[in-house]
């Protein structure tokens, strides 16, 4: 007997992927960021009321998305509360892969008189934060819990033992880390593996064609550690526009610097050739550079979310990736520039030992290529279905 194939997803967002080689949970290729959902920060970020937030969540979910990112700190807790209310009303909690974070001072505007232990990486902060997050999210478990940032006061041993306790008790399924130096992540994972504890499976941080620091240590570290990548800031936070377009009225996170102007012109040029948007090129860029990349896409407008979903079908050639790389100089720094760069060769993330010029003196080495990312439409082609 042959079982029927699952129905065709409504969009490319419904072709799910493995989160990382160390985390087998299935997630949509985009992660919906919810930092704008709430009233707590509307004076800074602009208004995104509950109806608008629910509309964004509904659009994402109905399009096949199941990967949603929140944090205890966002909007004074509104983001977690609203996502929790939405899941309760839609009765879809177990369909969602939900990530949240701890470490930030989430009680900043709370009634507590002494707030020193409501932040940090330590065990008490973790216990208080997770207890509060579970209540706000109206759930009894968190799929993916991130260390939001490293506090440089709590030991590796305390962090990993405390996190593993939550996993062992079923309150957390997978562990992630955000905004933390690569050497610390490797140290944490080495301690976890040596002691039978749960290591980090995902890294979240700032990465875009304008901010490529990720490519120095974080990206190689994730490849080596078997970790997925959930980059934020991929779309340039409204900065990836031509100078003319940026000068028009609209919400801006700040003035456009020269780097973003140059990249905006390059992305806009490519977008016109492909009949798409500059932000779509920016999204495709990071998803073409490494496997297990799940951009955290936020915002307040459904039409922008739909553009992000459509961009999953955008194909960039290796030459186009190089054009974007070369549009703005990037210094990978020592030792990678010493090992891989020459007057005629710039560092690329897909380089292997055959590209180390010092080792080519004695032999012409053949090496296995690095693992490649999933190609756009790969699932649709395999199952013989047309994209939507």
UniProtKB/Swiss-Prot annotation:
The active site is at 74 (proton donor). The keyword Metal-binding does not apply. Signal peptide: none annotated. It comes from the Eukaryota. Pfam families: Aldo_ket_red. NADP(+) binds at residues 233-243. Keywords: NADP, Oxidoreductase. Pathway: Mycotoxin biosynthesis; aflatoxin biosynthesis. Coiled coil: none annotated. CDD domains: AKR_AKR9A1-2. GO terms for molecular function: oxidoreductase activity. The keyword Membrane does not apply. One of its GO terms (biological process) is aflatoxin biosynthetic process. Its EC number is 1.1.1.-. PANTHER family: NADH-SPECIFIC METHYLGLYOXAL REDUCTASE-RELATED, NADP-DEPENDENT OXIDOREDUCTASE DOMAIN-CONTAINING PROTEIN-RELATED. Belongs to the aldo/keto reductase family. Aldo/keto reductase 2 subfamily. This is Norsolorinic acid reductase. It comes from Aspergillus flavus (strain ATCC 200026 / FGSC A1120 / IAM 13836 / NRRL 3357 / JCM 12722 / SRRC 167). The gene is norA.
């Amino acid at each position: 007997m042959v079982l029927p194939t699952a129905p065709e997803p409504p969009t490319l967002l419904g072709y799910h992927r493995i989160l990382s080689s160390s985390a087998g949970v299935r997630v949509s290729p985009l992660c919906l960021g919810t930092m704008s959902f709430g009233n707590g920060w509307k004076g800074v970020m602009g208004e995104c009321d509950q109806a608008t937030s629910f509309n964004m969540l509904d659009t994402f979910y109905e399009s096949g998305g199941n990967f949603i990112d929140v944090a205890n700190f966002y909007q004074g807790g509104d983001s977690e509360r609203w996502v929790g209310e939405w899941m309760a009303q839609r009765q879809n909690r177990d369909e969602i892969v939900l990530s949240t974070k701890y470490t930030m001072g989430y009680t900043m505007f709370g009634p507590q008189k002494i707030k020193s232990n409501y932040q940090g990486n330590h065990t008490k902060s973790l216990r208080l934060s997770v207890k509060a997050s579970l209540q706000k999210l109206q759930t009894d478990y968190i799929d993916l819990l991130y260390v939001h940032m490293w506090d440089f006061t709590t030991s590796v041993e305390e962090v990993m033992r405390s996190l593993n306790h939550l996993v062992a008790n079923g309150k957390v399924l997978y562990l992630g880390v955000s905004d933390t130096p690569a050497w610390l992540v490797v140290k944490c994972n080495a301690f976890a593996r040596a002691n039978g504890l749960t290591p980090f499976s995902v890294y979240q941080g700032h990465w875009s064609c304008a901010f490529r620091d990720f490519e120095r240590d974080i990206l190689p570290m994730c490849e080596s550690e078997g970790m997925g990548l959930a980059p934020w800031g991929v779309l340039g936070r409204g900065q990836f526009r031509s100078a003319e377009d940026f000068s028009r009225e609209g919400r801006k996170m700040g003035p456009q610097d020269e780097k973003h102007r140059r990249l905006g012109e390059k992305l806009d040029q490519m977008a016109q050739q492909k009949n798409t948007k500059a932000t779509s090129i920016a999204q495709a860029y990071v998803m073409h550079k490494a496997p297990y990349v799940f951009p955290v896409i936020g915002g307040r407008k459904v039409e922008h979310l739909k553009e992000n979903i459509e961009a999953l079908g955008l194909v960039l050639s290796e030459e186009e990736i190089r054009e974007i790389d070369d549009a703005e100089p990037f210094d990978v720094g020592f030792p990678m520039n010493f090992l891989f760069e020459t007057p005629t060769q710039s560092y690329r993330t897909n380089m292997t030992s055959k590209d180390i010029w010092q080792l080519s003196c004695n032999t012409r080495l053949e090496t296995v290529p690095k693992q490649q990312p999933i190609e756009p439409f790969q699932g649709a082609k395999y199952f013989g279905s047309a994209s939507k």
